[in-house]
């Protein structure tokens, strides 16, 4: 018999004695869906220089980590979201987030939001309504990611170490 645990629907972060609540990603929320549209996912790296970005400006686009800085050079008209999967990005390049993040949908891991609560508390206070927690499905719960812990969760460690099969997420976004 398989034990399926429900992922938390929210995560709370204490910022200057104020509890900031960020909802988890939920594909059933209408504003979280692209309704079957094509989408570009642009990450940062040397190959970005070879992309014909002028041809992609009107297509819904998801930016990953530092690629959001491209909105300073190009007029993207349909920003579908911004994904930060690496908490080190927050501490190594804080100016990118400060300069280019203006409330676009932001999807990030708990480790990223923990880093942001320390380095960018004002951004979290202002835009938490546009932020969504992404839970990793490729590793057991409780495994440390980017050297930041999930210690703010109030779940028992025993429950957090259960792997969730991908098939679970078909009916339970």
Give residue spans per PLM region.
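N-terminal pre-catalytic "stem/leader" segment of glycosyltransferase-like enzymes
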Residues: 1-35, 44
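Broad hydrophobic/π-residue packing in well-ordered secondary structure
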Residues: 34-40, 78-83
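Short, hydrophobic/glycine-enriched beta-strand segments
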Residues: 38-45, 60-64
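Short N-terminal binding/cap micro-motifs at the start of the first secondary-structure element
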Residues: 48-52
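Acidic/Gly/His-enriched mid-domain segments of enzyme catalytic cores or analogous surface patches
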Residues: 59-60, 66-172
């Amino acid at each position: 018999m398989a034990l399926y645990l429900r992922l938390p629907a929210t995560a709370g972060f204490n910022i200057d004695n104020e509890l900031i609540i960020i909802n988890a990603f939920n594909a059933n929320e209408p504003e979280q869906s692209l309704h079957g549209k094509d989408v570009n996912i642009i990450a940062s790296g040397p190959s970005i220089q070879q992309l014909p970005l002028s041809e992609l400006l009107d297509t819904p686009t998801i930016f990953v980590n530092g690629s959001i800085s491209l909105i300073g050079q190009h007029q993207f008209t349909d920003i579908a979201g911004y994904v930060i999967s690496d908490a080190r990005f927050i501490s190594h390049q804080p100016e990118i987030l400060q300069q280019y993040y203006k409330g676009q949908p932001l999807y990030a891991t708990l480790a990223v939001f923990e880093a942001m609560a320390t380095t960018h508390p004002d951004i979290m206070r202002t835009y938490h309504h546009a932020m969504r927690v992404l839970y990793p499905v490729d590793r057991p719960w409780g495994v440390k990611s980017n050297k930041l812990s999930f210690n703010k969760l109030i779940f028992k460690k025993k429950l957090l170490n259960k792997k969730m099969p991908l098939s679970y997420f078909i009916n339970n976004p």
